[in-house]
Amino acid sequence: MAAPGEALTQSGYIEHHLTNLSLAKLGLVADEASFWNVHIDSLFFSVFTGMLFLWVFRSVAKKATTGVPGKLQCFVEMIVEFVADNVKETFHGRNPLIAPLALTIFCWVILMNLMDLVPIDFLPYPAEHWLGIPYLKVVPSADVNITMAMALGVFALMIYYSIKVKGLGGFAKELALHPFNHPIMIPFNLLLEVISLLAKPLSLGMRLFGNMFAGEVVFILIAAMLPWYLQWVGALPWAIFHILVILIQAFVFMMLTIVYLSMAHEDSDH
């Protein structure tokens, strides 16, 4: 980190923009590795995008008309129908929570991912020079804490519905007697099933984090290597391509959530 008033080197610029505003950076906890060290910027922007989603959809729902709908209502209805169709095709149980959950995840992840299209210094520069905030990362889904928290939330629902639908005994039987239905294979079955079970939230969270973090790094590298008046030459093509990544990652996270919860609702003898 450069001294106050001193220009950052390329490596310093990259390191600065990859650093979260945390309680440790503000001296409120002793260690970066502390359990209580919260990434304030990731938490703020994840809550902000979540509240934005709720506000937009609530506003549209209150003003919805059976007559000629406005452009925003048409757009929201298109998203709702898209998610509902995917839930109908993929989820084979009966649970009124799944469609709203899938809609929330899809829209929330898209909004968090879209923060990656905000110019690199658009928010961090005024935050640092006008508000005295030393670090600011604006892409919540490029923070492994956020993506793994969402994945662990899905994992908790998987376990809850597996036990609720199959019973504790049925869930234990599924772990112990699959894929090989013989008592002597129980230890091997347990090892395979537990690894498979734990891999689901890990892959779910890390896939989203890895793709969004990589995209953020590319934008930072472009900003660090080119003068401000030429940055658009590299940033614009990457941003256009990155829009596809943003949408695909939100869709994948939503679909895997639906698939995992559908598996949790399946009868253990299915």
From Swiss-Prot:
Listed InterPro entries: ATP_syn_F0_a_bact/chloroplast, ATP_synth_F0_asu, ATP_synth_F0_asu_AS, F0_ATP_A_sf
Regions that span the bilayer: 37-57, 98-118, 143-163, 217-237, 239-259
GO cellular component: plasma membrane; proton-transporting ATP synthase complex
SUPFAM superfamilies the UniProt entry points to: F1F0 ATP synthase subunit A
UniProtKB keywords: ATP synthesis, Cell inner membrane, Cell membrane, CF(0), Hydrogen ion transport, Ion transport, Membrane, Transmembrane, Transmembrane helix, Transport
Protein's cellular compartments: Cell inner membrane
Molecular-function annotations in GO: proton-transporting ATP synthase activity, rotational mechanism
UniProt keyword Ion transport, yes or no: yes
Gene3D superfamilies to which the protein is assigned, alphabetical: ATP synthase, F0 complex, subunit A
Pfam families in alphabetical order: ATP-synt_A
NCBIfam families: ATP_synt_6_or_A, PRK05815.1-1
Function: Key component of the proton channel; it plays a direct role in the translocation of protons across the membrane.
Record family assignment: Belongs to the ATPase A chain family.
Assembly: F-type ATPases have 2 components, CF(1) - the catalytic core - and CF(0) - the membrane proton channel. CF(1) has five subunits: alpha(3), beta(3), gamma(1), delta(1), epsilon(1). CF(0) has three main subunits: a(1), b(2) and c(9-12). The alpha and beta chains form an alternating ring which encloses part of the gamma chain. CF(1) is attached to CF(0) by a central stalk formed by the gamma and epsilon chains, while a peripheral stalk is formed by the delta and b chains.
Protein name: ATP synthase subunit a
Organism: Aliivibrio fischeri (strain ATCC 700601 / ES114)
Gene name linked to the record: atpB
